[in-house]
Swiss-Prot record:
One of its GO terms (cellular component) is synapse. Plays a role in skin pigmentation by antagonizing the action of melanotropin alpha. Induces melanin concentration within the melanophores. May participate in the control of the hypothalamo-pituitary adrenal gland axis by inhibiting the release of ACTH. It comes from the Eukaryota. InterPro entries: Prepro-melanin_conc_hormone. Belongs to the melanin-concentrating hormone family. This is Pro-MCH 1. Keywords: Cleavage on pair of basic residues, Disulfide bond, Hormone, Neuropeptide, Signal. GO terms for molecular function: melanin-concentrating hormone activity; type 1 melanin-concentrating hormone receptor binding. One of its GO terms (biological process) is neuropeptide signaling pathway. Disulfide bonds join C120-C129. Pituitary gland. Produced in neurons of lateral basal hypothalamus which project both to the brain and to the neural lobe of the pituitary gland from where MCH is released. Residues 1-24 form the signal peptide.
Amino acid sequence: MRHSVLSISFAVALFLECYTPSTAIPIGKMDDVALEQDTLDSLLRVEVSENSPDSVRGRSSKIVLLADSGLWMNLNRGLPLYKLIAAAAGPDRALTLDRREAGQDLSPSISIVRRDTMRCMVGRVYRPCWEV
């Protein structure tokens, strides 16, 4: 019942809006419209010149800063514990050194620098994943 009343009222509103007859403006009226537009433009220019930075210097100005609330959350409280620990340890501690076994590679002296990433199982394989 509610959907039918709403759809009928919407259809009537659209029909009345589209059915209003359009009228032509005579040439004499056209000059008046242009004159009104010119006066509006001049008033806006006066208002803009009054609010110019030169005239604001005498008055006290307010600075408003807007920020996304997600930025504030991620500053300290929103980070997971392991990220906070890695950030507190410093950039040199964030990377770990792993050595390969002698049987895996021909040159065991080469060290591999690997980031500490989480591993998620995708299908049958563990892949690196990121926190959502």
